[in-house]
């Protein structure tokens, strides 16, 4: 893409492999992972009951990763970039806005995964992976890639730290509110990163192919 940095293709493929592996472990009810999820969730439950203000705050914070917020923000950004004639960037954002929710919804339909019982927020659907966490990771990565060519070293570090922190806060909120197990959140982060990266890479490849064909047509020989 002309104005958005493209991530290396190996990274999202590794992330997708990790998501698939995690899904398999959950599907076979791997005991160490189950114990880890249960132990961390019970600590979150105990802490939440003892600190109701913490729970109330996270109920607001967690909405930053909600599906409607992600769809609205992605659509708005794609339209703005289209208006600025940054067509490839707009296409990548639009593709990501569709692909990430579709990705976690596909996992929800495929893998039966009950959520923690008696959570502070009740959600009636399968839990792996966390859609909120996937949205936060994807949005953070897209923001970093958009800003990367325009920032110097310090600015890039700040952008990466801010993106990671935002995704972490949303993910932690899902565990703390007992709407997801910790492994659901990890799966969401990995899926969001992978799909956003692949969307950017796919549009970049199409753009490169178009340029190659154009240059070949223009060649008088």
Sequence positions of predicted segments:
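N-terminal transmembrane-helix/juxtamembrane module of multi-pass inner/ER membrane proteins
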Residues: 1-69, 110-119
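Interfacial segments of alpha-helical transmembrane regions
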Residues: 7-16, 73-100
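Membrane-embedded catalytic cores of phosphoryl/pyrophosphoryl-handling enzymes
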Residues: 74, 119-221
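Hydrophobic alpha-helical transmembrane segments
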Residues: 62-85, 139-141, 147
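Aromatic-anchored segments of alpha-helical transmembrane domains
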Residues: 22-23, 98-105, 165-175
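Membrane-helix interface segments
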Residues: 53, 85-90, 117, 153-158
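Membrane-water interface at transmembrane helix exits
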Residues: 41, 45, 104-112, 144, ...
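Hydrophobic alpha-helical transmembrane segments of integral membrane proteins
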Residues: 88-121
